[in-house]
């Protein structure tokens, strides 16, 4: 008997509160998480608490049946079951407020674990595919036949490329050296021009100082001339006033003085004419003096003005030249700084190019030395192989000669056997001695028994036939002919 799912969606078992009935098995309907229906109660209760006396036959957490227990076939007799009365009391079943949250968290954890499990499965499949791919590649590489490649053309091409690169580096080094020389020459020219402009500036400054002194002298002279002109004007005014005063006094004396003159009636003296003539002379002298003073003053003023204008124009031209020289000096200074920067950059580039060229040349030399060593070793190996090949060919030639000799001997022996000739001993002669025989050799000489044949032989040991290979003489078995 189970309760519904109204308590937070969890099912709990009440079958533990009732005892087992005959002919029935106890089936637990507890949730999969545990045996407690309410997580807040300590200890809780479940389906196994009541059926503790029938533990051997109780059902598990997965609603399974075990043979030989309560859930299996009923035995012929049922034993008495003792039940704890305290378990029959009503239970205080309450809804856990955190049960929904816990259930939601468990669902989220299950989803996360399912996602991870799916990711692991995908990863395992991917790794299996990669493993199969690698196994296929491994089998392909194992089944592929190894072919010998001649590396000498590759090394020669690489050496040629390194040589061309070294030549390009040398050409670039020469070009950069020429550019550096040109830049140095340009810098020397700019330096000379700068020194010339500095000397011209010093000369212009000296001329400016001299002209300034001349202008100061002219200004002082002008001031002196103005002071002199003013003094002369004052003196002229004073003389004019003095002349007027003297004339007035003279007229007053003449008009107030009565002079008794004894006159000679024989002559007539007109004093008015004499006075008028003297007055006219004085007036003429005064006017000429005034005109001369004014003309001299005007001339001097014009000269001073012309001198001032000329010196002002010269000063203006000198200032313009000084400003132009300053601008030229600034421009030349900037050009010199730019030339210095370019020279520094070119020197750094040349140094870097030299270092790179030296490194490339050193690397090329090392690789060339390695290639030469490898080539020399290959030549030595080839010479050894040729020597071994020559030795093998010599051995083969000797074996061919021996095989031919044996074939001829066998053919001759067959012919003798066919003709009925007795058995003869065959020996293989040595190149260093003759044959030991008692019969005639092929050469026609009869050697002494136990001595060497004088005829040249092939150098082999005697065989069981008892005949010498070149001469057909009989020798003992196992001895040298």
From Swiss-Prot:
Positions of region (Coil 1B): 152-252
Region: Head, residue numbers: 1-106
Q: Could you say which tissues express the protein in this record?
A: Expressed in dorsal skin.
What Pfam family is a match for this entry? Answer: Keratin_2_head
Chain positions covered by the region annotation Linker 12: 253-269
UniProtKB keywords: Coiled coil, Intermediate filament, Isopeptide bond, Keratin, Ubl conjugation
Report residues of the Glycyl lysine isopeptide (Lys-Gly) (interchain with G-Cter in SUMO1) crosslink. 212
Query: Which residue intervals make up region (Linker 1)?
Result: 142-151
Give the source's domain of life in one word.
Eukaryota
Question: What PANTHER family does the record tag this protein with?
Answer: GATA-TYPE DOMAIN-CONTAINING PROTEIN (PTHR45616), KERATIN, TYPE II CUTICULAR HB3 (PTHR45616:SF52)
Question: What's this protein's name?
Answer: Keratin, type II cuticular Hb1
Q: Which organism is it from?
A: Mus musculus (Mouse)
Instruction: Give the lineage.
Output: Eukaryota, Metazoa, Chordata, Craniata, Vertebrata
């Amino acid at each position: 008997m189970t309760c519904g799912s109204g308590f937070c969606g969890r099912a709990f078992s009440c079958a533990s509160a009732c005892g087992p009935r005959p002919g029935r098995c106890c089936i637990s309907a507890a949730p999969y998480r545990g045996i407690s229906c309410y997580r807040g109660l300590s200890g809780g209760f479940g389906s196994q608490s009541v059926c503790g006396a029938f533990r051997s036959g109780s059902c598990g957490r997965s609603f399974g049946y075990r043979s030989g227990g309560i859930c299996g076939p009923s035995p012929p007799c049922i034993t008495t079951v003792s039940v704890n009365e305290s378990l029959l009391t009503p239970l205080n079943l309450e809804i856990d407020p955190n049960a929904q949250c816990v259930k939601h968290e468990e669902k989220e954890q299950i989803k996360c674990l399912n996602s991870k499990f799916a990711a692991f499965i995908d990863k395992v499949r991917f790794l299996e595919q990669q493993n199969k791919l690698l196994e296929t590649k491994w089998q392909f590489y194992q089944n592929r036949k190894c072919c010998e490649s001649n590396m000498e053309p590759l090394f020669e091409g690489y050496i040629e490329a390194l040589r061309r690169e070294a030549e390009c580096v040398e050409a670039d080094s020469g070009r950069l050296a020429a550019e550096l020389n040109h830049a140095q020459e340009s810098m020397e020219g700019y330096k000379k021009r700068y020194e010339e402009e500095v000397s011209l500036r010093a000369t212009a400054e000296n001329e400016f100082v001299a002209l300034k002194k001349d202008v100061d002298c002219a200004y002082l002279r002008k001031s002196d001339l103005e002071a002199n002109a003013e003094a002369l004007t004052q003196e002229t005014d004073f003389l004019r006033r003095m002349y007027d005063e003297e004339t007035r006094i003279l007229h007053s004396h003449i008009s107030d003085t009565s002079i008794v003159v004894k006159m000679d009636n024989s002559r007539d003296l007109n004093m008015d004419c004499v006075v008028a003539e003297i007055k006219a002379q004085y007036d003429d002298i005064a006017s000429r003096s005034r005109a001369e003073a004014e003309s001299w003053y005007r001339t001097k003023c014009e000269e001073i003005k012309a001198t001032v204008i000329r010196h002002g124009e010269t000063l203006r031209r000198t200032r313009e030249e000084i400003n132009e020289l300053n601008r030229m000096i600034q421009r030349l200074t900037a050009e010199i700084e730019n030339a210095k920067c370019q020279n520094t950059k070119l020197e750094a580039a040349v140094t870097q190019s030299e270092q790179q060229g030296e490194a490339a040349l050193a690397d090329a030399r090392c690789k060339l030395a390695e290639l030469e060593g490898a080539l020399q070793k290959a030549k030595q190996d080839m010479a050894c192989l040729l020597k071994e090949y020559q030795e093998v060919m010599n051995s083969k030639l000797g074996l061919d000669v021996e095989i031919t000799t044996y074939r001829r001997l066998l053919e001759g022996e067959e012919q003798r056997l066919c003709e009925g000739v007795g058995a003869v001993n065959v020996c293989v002669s040595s190149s260093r001695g003759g044959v030991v025989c008692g019969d005639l050799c092929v050469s026609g000489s009869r050697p002494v028994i136990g001595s060497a044949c004088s005829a040249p032989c092939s150098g082999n040991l005697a065989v069981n036939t008892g005949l010498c290979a070149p001469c057909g003489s009989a020798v003992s078995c196992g001895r040298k002919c």
